[in-house]
Curated annotation (Swiss-Prot):
This is Cysteine desulfurase, mitosomal. [2Fe-2S] cluster binds at C357. It comes from Encephalitozoon cuniculi (strain GB-M1). GO terms for biological process: [2Fe-2S] cluster assembly. The modification N6-(pyridoxal phosphate)lysine is found at K235. Its EC number is 2.8.1.7. Belongs to the class-V pyridoxal-phosphate-dependent aminotransferase family. NifS/IscS subfamily. The keyword Metal-binding applies. Keywords: Iron, Iron-sulfur, Metal-binding, Mitosome, Pyridoxal phosphate, Transferase. Pyridoxal 5'-phosphate binds at A102, T103, Q212, C232, A233, H234, T272. InterPro entries: Aminotrans_V_dom (IPR000192), Aminotrans_V_PyrdxlP_BS (IPR020578), Cys_deSase_IscS (IPR010240), Cysteine_dSase (IPR016454), PyrdxlP-dep_Trfase (IPR015424), PyrdxlP-dep_Trfase_major (IPR015421), PyrdxlP-dep_Trfase_small (IPR015422).
Amino acid sequence: MIGGLKSCIEQPSLPKPSTLLPQDKACDTGGKRIFLDVQSTTPVDPRVLDAMLPFYTTVFGNPHSRTHRYGWQAEAAVEKARSQVASLIGCDPKEIIFTSGATESNNLALKGVSGFKLKEGKAAHIITLQTEHKCILDTCRNLEENGVEVTYLPVGNDGVVDIDDVKKSIKENTVLVSIGAVNSEIGTVQPLKEIGMLCKERGVLFHTDAAQGVGKIQIDVNEMNIDLLSMCAHKIYGPKGIGALYVRRRPRVRMVPLINGGGQERGLRSGTVASPLVVGFGKAAEICSKEMKRDFEHIKELSKKLKNMFKKNIEGVIINGSEKGFPGCVNVSFPFVEGESLLMHLKDIALSSGSACTSASLEPSYVLRALGRDDELAHSSIRFGIGRFTMAKEIDIVANKTVEAVQKLREMSPLYEMVKEGIDLSKISWTS
């Protein structure tokens, strides 16, 4: 039915928003402000907005209405977008379940799988990492309160998990291993293929939170033996409020839904699918499929430039994470500088001291502490996010302003003065 409706979404009279929002204007910094916080969100690509707007005005039908043209048009558009998203990760379109975002997808994966086991009266054990996103860790803590056993594995000082630790942690009642593709704070890329192979050999489901990985690094769920994968649109230059969970069909992943209702999305996520958001997600995925390699090389070049400028001009600077991590996430510790103070000195630059979900907390980053960083170093860290629309001249501005701010703040630090005078702080006996 859907194949015969492709013509329904051909609308020659639809508005062309690109004439109102050209790409250079959409990403204009206004000459002052610079956005380097792409791990928290990304600007909507103007081509994505072009694709979305007609579905707010002309093609506004409910995609679940099967009795008239408005519904057929919306349904055809949703299914096209489902195919675009599926193509990005190498799966069947029927394996894509649309959600409100990666947080919901993660909740559905963890609670859905463990909930099915508990419903059968069986014990459930989940394995994850100490450095996972807060929505994974909080969901696991919630599951622990409901009888699910959870193992939180440590990582190395580069943020990468030891495969042997995963292997040793798998037990008879282990139902799921949940390990993120790319860490949102330090950009560490986990060995998904090796983990997936291990899980397949041991008969355990493998879930990955790929919100920071999809569209940025190559991910193929079949090659990597991934059974469940969470993603969202607003991390790949699409709209906020829409995400997806890939759920393998063969062999079938058994799970219970979080939301009951009309039985949409294979009964796993009831509720009317927001066709404008889904269309935007699909277009963003299509662009990533075509331009991922170019984006990666652009980001890699700017990342190298930023790191080199810091290393050349700031004494003792520490780049956190793995050298083989995603280059667009540059987490830097500036010893003897308070991270929050540095952010205040760089108020015209959008940066973060950690995940957007935890950056309001004054606690040092739990991710950096898991890497073995002490509280002082963790407090001195800033994340620089480089994306598709970041320009080389912006990197120059950011690097120069950061160097200047670090030098000013260090001049006010008595500890830094002591270090410059050759005093070994570790040998000082501090009194309270």
